């Protein structure tokens, strides 16, 4: 099957927003218009709308699907969903990684909100071009120009309106196009009847003023336009559109549009802007990666002629087809039934069926081309962030960084039947979400789940109940502490048992030294002359790894330690792997006496937004929670405080902040790094763990 849409006519976009800005409704309306109405003004039978909703209820995944394909104005638009909540930053990161452009949805009453800032910052880091859609223009208190101002004040974004609203709140009835200088008036609430007419007299002056500002802002990004502008020559609409497109793709300019997705106003014009101003895969730099055989950096331009290279960005379990791996093709062509190399894992994978999610159905396709986004069925070893490439032209694309989980809960199945189901459910959820970990406590047999925050774990436990029908009791959230050594030491581990039958004998000398932060455990074999036979050395390493899973102070996993095995002895008959494993664990226990073991705790970067009057309270909250303030900035009448605070001190803070600020304060936190806990706190943690 030949390529249906050229690369120039392909758009891969995401819809990003703060939690309640109306992202889902916007996505839903986009799918609704692109799936059913190919040009504005087509009448639309009620029946088709019904099928669409039924289909959605039956599967419930259309809107939340990782990637949906739609068509608009002769272009293919792939929409990648991004969640708005901070606990799901990995979802946002992984979607930004495979996007070429994005639509940032604002609530036009609130403008830029804290989570908009987080997502905007991440999009800037990834260099993603954006257009802004000020939604909810029909809402009480909606104020388009205030929203535009918040883009300047809070994000320092060079954002300018390319539209103005006609009316607001209940009177919101149309949109002025500042490029064509025409008014689009809506005559019904379906958004299907639009009259294009001259700008109403009372709006003309404002429209001319904002068109002038728009031309000036765009001219500043382009020398040729600037010359024309300064010489007083007229800039044509075509030149203006080309200038906006170039500046938007270079992430120097952000066009702002308005509308109400709920009332079906402005969505089609926003889709026109996606086509006009956001990049195709040809407009962005070629993706870079490393050749695993030569370690040389290579790039893959977006072209069907290049060797196949793709990035898996999400795993989902679908009730109808099983495990789906969503991937973005950067170069080359892939046919279903073919084999690819997962270069991240070094494993060969067979691509079973290839599916594309359409606005309201799934379609099985034979071939995917460069720039496409699709889902494959049948991949066994591939997880989020893995590269899939041609077996003859291997490349490892830059992966998606996965943050370490910082909070954990104990989950306990309510019945024996639940126990078996829970194991399967947790395994599937962990496959889908790399920031979610499942561990079993060796001593107690309890199952512990770990994730990025309380909401993250709540959602996963809820999914376990709803999707997998598992009933479980859930413990209170706990902090994921770590342990390490802060000093170097040498220790002997000697294990000998001789009481009838075959004896046991293992003897090792190990030097322990602190490792760099984040480097984990490293083992070095420095045995000379065979004092410990080669076949027992892996057993020594294994013995250390197993013992370090339950650390020496309070049973938390040990990290960032180097161990060098440098001496020992053995017995011809009695030595065994088991004996050397035990000897290694005894050496670790012995080392703990002199290696200054320490407990580490997760430190969160907390951003607190509160009214200026409450600044004193907020500073007090940070200090009382063993935190340290990193910086402050004023935002209108609010203050934003950035601070590092231990996660252990942040439980229940939402309630404290709410009552101190009469509900006007908000905060967000993300994991930043691990730090030693103070001695007094360390003693409490040890006491608590020994007492249990």
UniProtKB/Swiss-Prot annotation:
Predominant place of localization: cytoplasm
Spell out the Gene3D superfamilies in the cross-references. Answer: 3.30.230.10, 3.30.70.240, Elongation Factor G (Translational Gtpase), domain 3, P-loop containing nucleotide triphosphate hydrolases, Translation factors
The GO terms this record gives for MF are: GTP binding; GTPase activity; translation elongation factor activity
**Keywords, ordered alphabetically:** Cytoplasm, Elongation factor, GTP-binding, Nucleotide-binding, Protein biosynthesis
Which InterPro entries would you find in this protein's record?
Answer: EFG_II, EFG_III, EFG_III/V, EFG_IV, EFG_V, EFG_V-like, EFTu-like_2, G_TR_CS
Q: Does the keyword DNA repair apply?
A: no
**Family matches, as PROSITE patterns:** G_TR_1 (PS00301), G_TR_2 (PS51722)
Which sites bind GTP? 17-24, 81-85, 135-138
Subcellular localization is given as:
Cytoplasm
CDD domains reported in the protein's UniProt record: EF-G (cd01886), EFG_III (cd16262), EFG_mtEFG1_IV (cd01434), EFG_mtEFG_C (cd03713), EFG_mtEFG_II (cd04088)
Membrane-spanning parts: none
This protein's source sits in the domain of life called Bacteria
A GO CC term assigned to this protein in UniProt: cytoplasm
Q: Name one GO biological process term.
A: ribosome disassembly
Residue ranges annotated for the tr-type G domain, each copy included: 8-282
> What HAMAP family has UniProt attached to this entry?
EF_G_EF_2_B
- Give the similarity note: Belongs to the TRAFAC class translation factor GTPase superfamily. Classic translation factor GTPase family. EF-G/EF-2 subfamily.
The UniProt entry, under PANTHER family, shows:
RIBOSOME-RELEASING FACTOR 2, MITOCHONDRIAL, TRANSLATION ELONGATION FACTOR G-RELATED
Query: Its biological function?
Result: Catalyzes the GTP-dependent ribosomal translocation step during translation elongation. During this step, the ribosome changes from the pre-translocational (PRE) to the post-translocational (POST) state as the newly formed A-site-bound peptidyl-tRNA and P-site-bound deacylated tRNA move to the P and E sites, respectively. Catalyzes the coordinated movement of the two tRNA molecules, the mRNA and conformational changes in the ribosome.
Q: From the Swiss-Prot or TrEMBL record, give the protein name.
A: Elongation factor G
Provide the species name.
Streptococcus equi subsp. equi (strain 4047)
